[in-house]
Amino acid sequence: MLTLDTLNVMLAVSEEGLIEEMIIALLASPQLAVFFEKFPRLKAAITDDVPRWREALRSRLTDARVPPELTEEVMCYQQSQLLSTPQFIVQLPQILDLLHRLNSPWAEQARQLVDANSSITSALHTLFLQRWRLSLIVQATTLNQQLLEEEREQLLSEVQERMTLSGQLEPILADNNTGAGRLWDMSAGQLKRGDYQLIVKYGEFLNEQPELKRLAEQLGRSREAKSIPRNDAQMETFRTMVREPATVPEQVDGLQQSDDILRLLPPELATLGITELEYEFYRRLVEKQLLTYRLHGESLREKVIERPVVHKDYDEQPRGPFIVCVDTSGSMGGFNEQCAKAFCLALMRIALAENRRCYIMLFSTEIVRYELSGPQGIEQAIRFLNQQFRGGTDLASCFRAIMERLQSREWFDADAVVISDFIAQRLPDDVTSKVKELQRVHQHRFHAVAMSAHGKPGIMRIFDHIWRFDTGMRSRLLRRWRR
């Protein structure tokens, strides 16, 4: 069967002009005009998608089949072009019958032209073929326009769905034109409104926690530059962390009286459920007279010293991908879970804006992986946000998975980020030594995002940077009060 592309070539119909007209009409539609005004960053991303639209439309016209009736009429026209005038006169009755049988738009006009002339001359033969060709061109153009109109409606529907999705997620995930472009590319998947609303929900939560958002931005910029020393140095304040014995959850050392709700003895907690003893419980809480476990271990304390300023200039450093390990143990549930997921969303925003990769691994009793910056990034982000934090803590497996990933060539300059409360068993010696080797030999950097003030120093000392975001009730109230 004849293809539409072949028919266009035979009749010299310009399909490129029809495609350009359709694309211009699509870009000038009121829906896109309003969207471009509201989201100017996405305008460039959609405009960059125009070549793909053009190629898809061209492919559609190339593969389209011409109706059998029109195919038969075109074949008859081609055969008629090869006839001499005497041969054409002989074949004319059959040609007219064929046109009538095919319900050709040219059939009635052809019969009128023949009836209006008593004899068929060479000039009339040429005129007949010219007008017949014009009729075929009109039919081919109409067929092209019908197919393009169908494609336009389908394309407009697809663009509107992607605009709705991108418009909802642009304030959350697009920090610049690069991020907007990658967001538009990822919006091509089949997503329903209820799916991506989960990202909107965590985006709103992140906006309510500006300190958490700022922490993610600082981590993203932490590889921004390196310093170059100079001779004339001034003094500056320098803060460092020192270890000292303190009350941290490493070892139970006895009982004490305090107001530490997390370490409360069960009998004390039972009095809270007795109406007659409730006020007595609150009194002892205020006076720090509740019986709690006394814990013994090491803690980190901030020490402030003065030292010379040695920074003179900054040299831009390459920023690699993120490998983020998220603790999904039961202790990370609730508010910790919300913060961990929102923090990953903030890292995804940074990765899209800076054209970096963002790879998420959830560690508990098994490792679950998500690529948030790939073509299916939005679907992967939704699956990640739907995960529940109810497992145990296997920090060693997390580090082994990170180290295995870092050995791959495409991740040689990656930064590893571990999000946890770090209330877990000590790391095996082989894991610790391997991490130190990666830090020393390959300059890999390990970041800890600590969601608790009670993380074990023995675990956290292997990290290059510790970003603290205490999710305890006291810290949450203080942050709210400061805002």
Swiss-Prot record:
Q: Which Gene3D superfamilies match?
A: von Willebrand factor, type A domain
Q: What is this protein called?
A: Regulatory protein ViaA
Q: Which SUPFAM superfamilies match?
A: vWA-like
| Functional description taken from the UniProt entry | Component of the RavA-ViaA chaperone complex, which may act on the membrane to optimize the function of some of the respiratory chains. ViaA stimulates the ATPase activity of RavA.
Name the principal localization, coarsely classed.
cytoplasm
Query: Which organism's genome codes for this protein?
Result: Shigella dysenteriae serotype 1 (strain Sd197)
Tell me which GO cellular component terms the UniProt record holds.
cytosol
What HAMAP family would the database entry show?
Answer: ViaA
Q: Do you know which Pfam families this protein is assigned to?
A: VWA_CoxE
Q: Which SMART domains match?
A: VWA
